[in-house]
Amino acid sequence: MDVRFDKSFLKSLEKYNDINLLNKVDKAISNCESAESLKDIPNLKKLSGFKNYYRIKIGSYRIGFELIQKRQIRFIIFTHRKDIYKKFP
């Protein structure tokens, strides 16, 4: 899949210094890039009530992204699970 990053996603990543957590985020992004379809992405869930918005679970953290086209996704936010649904979508 074609992966794009919002400035808000990159800015939210800068808040975290935990190398293990950032490695897991990198692995999740790599999984998205190599995936043929959304079904191939682990820990993925569609957000109810929204047509093209999904989240990827990484422990207590979430990555929020939007499906722009069939094979193109845009990462929007990375934050703790208690905050993701306040800020996304």
Which functions belong to the PLM regions below?
Residues 1-28:
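Arg/Lys-rich, positively charged N-terminal/basic patches that mediate binding to nucleic acids
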Residues 2, 7, 19, 58-62, ...:
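Enriched for short, Lys/Arg-rich terminal
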Residues 11, 31, 83:
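Active-site micro-motifs of SAM-dependent methyltransferase domains
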Residues 30-55:
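A short, surface-exposed loop/turn module that caps and links secondary-structure elements
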